[in-house]
């Protein structure tokens, strides 16, 4: 383990970028050494972390889709064990419940743990092959969204005229090709900088907040549009 370098005094502290749930094994390290969780974190371990509010971000995406008139909204999630993934799923489900819409198991797909383009592509094709197909796809990462757009287009669907696609992260690729992707922007640079600031404070024996939540932004672009009845909508134009 790289964390073993702390015990060997080969490092003075650590920033963790991919902490999964059930990470209690980290606590003994954090009790002896300065450690900060950055972006991904386990809320059940007492280790400083900095992130965005993935639950609220998912609610913001869903509110956007609902405001556009979408009712058949699918989620392309992941098989990983990140807290952010769980919170985006919860935000999706809670938004449906608050809108009086059913949570349809057939509208939820779990892509690979590493958010690959191909898994987004395959998930979108699976979702859009249903007779009562969804009219909007909420993808928990931009790479999944880019794959979903490619999958939809290969099937003959137009984005956003026939199906809306929304991502998460705001990576550079979302504005390289049309349609530009509607997505949640995470302040990745600020997250990294704040994590380093927190680590520096811990390394110097100073008190720090246990959690820091930085603001996100919903970037509304070309891949999302109002629900309307088009030539490919016959089974689900309700």
Describe the residue ranges of each PLM region:
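Structural motif corresponding to alpha-helix initiation and N-cap regions
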Residues: 19-23
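Bacterial carbohydrate/catabolite-sensing allosteric modules
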Residues: 1-10, 24-25, 30-37, 41-238
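Intrinsically disordered, low-complexity polar regions and short flexible loop motifs
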Residues: 14
């Amino acid at each position: 383990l790289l964390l073993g370098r702390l015990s060997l005094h080969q490092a003075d502290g650590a920033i963790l970028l991919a902490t999964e749930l059930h990470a209690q094994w980290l606590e003994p390290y954090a009790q002896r050494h300065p450690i900060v969780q950055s972006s991904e974190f386990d809320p059940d371990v007492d280790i400083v972390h900095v992130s965005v509010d993935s639950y609220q971000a998912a609610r913001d995406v869903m509110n956007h889709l609902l405001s556009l008139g979408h009712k058949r909204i699918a989620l392309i999630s992941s098989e990983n064990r990140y807290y952010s993934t769980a919170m985006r799923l919860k935000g999706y489900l809670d938004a449906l419940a608050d809108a009086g819409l059913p949570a349809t198991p057939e509208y939820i797909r779990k892509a690979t743990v590493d958010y690959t383009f191909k898994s987004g592509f395959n998930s979108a094709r699976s979702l859009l092959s249903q007779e009562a197909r969804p009219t909007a796809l909420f993808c928990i990462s931009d790479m999944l969204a880019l794959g979903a757009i490619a999958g939809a287009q290969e099937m003959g669907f137009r984005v956003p005229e026939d199906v809306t696609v929304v991502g998460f992260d705001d990576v550079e690729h979302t504005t390289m090709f049309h349609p530009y992707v509607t997505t949640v922007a995470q302040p990745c640079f600020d997250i990294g900088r704040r994590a380093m600031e927190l680590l520096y404070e811990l390394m110097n024996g100073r008190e720090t907040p246990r959690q820091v939540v930085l603001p996100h932004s919903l970037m509304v672009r070309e891949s999302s549009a109002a629900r309307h009845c088009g030539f490919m909508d016959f089974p689900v134009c309700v």
